[in-house]
Regions:
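PLP-dependent amino-acid enzyme catalytic core
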Residues: 1-410
Length: 410
């Protein structure tokens, strides 16, 4: 049964726009945790060599559907020895989603979405996106042999577009912003018969259950001792809600003894969820004239705002906005100290954890998990000035070589 994520009333609306008609929250298909709880606990304990599909019992997917998979999931949970010590946090962890096949956590959605679409005989898919979602959907469409149309704004970063093009995606520029491109993919569904693969619960709630596996994997890596805080970047708002849902399921099954506080992070230049949280509102409003280097969370409209706000508040967490200079600082620190290059949106989670630690919210010994949702390998231009003054040395000139080495040891 489909129901509202907040008021839990049954959903009886259209099947292409899943929004609660009572409170405006997202819709879900909850797992029956009472049907065979010991089996579900066993699934969680064992984990999976098959990536997220080892947790199939926690999805609403037909039994005869063959997964379209590329080994997504089972990403490492890194205890940050150097980065944590640098910032004064002994238990700072990174859930490194950059190691998914397309370099993003969106693969957890795309594998389920494409599996469901293939089961339904879909031959074409479309998505309005300029970032991680487009990369993931294009990759899995290629794997499934589907044609993929990508609507992206003219200002989209070329590095991200090139990745999508390499998978065979067809580009169509949508005049306007990302939200206009999302609408274009949605409107085209009735005309062209493609499946709109927008990575939101209001579009594809069943596929969004793939994100819950971030929680399952993290808990297993921590021997089912739940973290005190989980820090998630927020654009549309779905990851913070679905990760928490995963923890709620484990708590209900008795696998963990407490629930983490969820921290929702946005860039200061585009922070509709943070604004709504600070003002005590239950829904977000469109953010006008935003600007940030954190392109992956540059969403003026928080599609899952009602559910995300409810999640953060129920968990005892908070929403926080981080300025671009602090995001860039965290991005560079993570690369230098942990050899992980997060995209700016992901680095924002580290910057948020640091800020909350400095403010006394997060303690020195608190267990903090930052979810790094995407790779920064497409954002390397942000490192351009790191080695701007590179010394040159002629072969055999040891004096110049010594000076060159000393140049970096100032």
């Amino acid at each position: 049964m489909m129901r509202c994520t907040v008021c839990h009333k049954p959903y009886v609306g259209p099947k292409n726009h899943y929004v609660c008609t009572y409170c405006g929250a997202s819709i879900e298909s909850p797992v029956d945790l009472e049907k065979n709880p010991e089996h579900l606990r066993d699934v969680l304990r064992k984990g999976s060599e098959d990536g997220i599909w080892g947790y199939r019992d926690f999805f609403t997917v037909p039994e005869d559907a063959q997964p379209v998979t590329m080994g997504e999931g089972n990403t490492p949970l890194i205890h940050t020895d150097r980065l944590g010590a640098f910032y004064g946090m002994k238990n700072l962890y990174l859930k490194n989603e950059t190691l998914n096949p397309s370099g993003t956590y969106k693969d957890r959605f795309a594998t389920v979405a494409t599996t469901l679409a293939k089961k339904d005989g879909i031959k074409q898919v479309a998505i309005g996106s300029a970032g991680n979602a487009a990369a993931a959907v294009a990759a899995y469409a290629a794997k499934a042999g589907m044609e993929c149309f990508i609507m992206l704004p003219p200002g989209a970063e070329k590095e991200r577009a090139w990745q999508n093009m390499s998978y065979g995606g067809h580009f169509i520029y949508g005049v306007g912003g990302v939200n206009d491109c999302v609408k274009m993919a949605e409107d085209g569904e009735a005309i062209f018969g493609w499946k709109n693969m927008c990575t939101t619960m209001m579009n594809y709630p069943l596929a969004c259950d793939g994100y819950k596996t971030i929680a399952y994997e993290t808990a297993r890596s921590m021997k089912f001792e739940a973290p005190d805080y989980v820090v998630c970047p927020v654009g549309g708002g779905i990851v913070v809600s679905k990760v928490y849902k995963g923890y709620e399921e484990m708590y209900a099954l008795g696998m963990i003894d407490h629930l983490p506080k969820m921290i929702a992070v946005q860039a200061a230049g585009c922070a509709p969820l943070v604004k709504a949280f600070d003002e005590g509102k239950t829904a977000t409003e469109k953010w006008e004239n935003g600007d940030t280097i954190a392109f992956a969370i540059f969403d003026p409209v928080t599609f899952e705002g009602v559910t995300a706000l409810d999640t953060v508040r129920r968990s005892g967490g908070r929403a926080i906005a981080i300025p671009d200079d602090k995001i860039l600082e965290a991005m560079r620190a993570c690369a230098k100290m942990e050899a992980v290059i997060p995209e700016p949106a992901s680095a924002a989670t580290i910057a948020a954890a640091v800020k909350l630690h400095e403010d006394g919210v997060i303690g020195e010994n608190d267990r903090v998990v930052c979810v790094l949702t995407g790779s920064g390998l497409r954002d390397l231009k942000l490192f351009n000035d790191e080695n701007a003054d590179i010394p040159s040395v002629q072969p055999g000139d040891m004096d110049s070589l010594k000076k060159a080495v000393n140049h970096y040891q100032k």
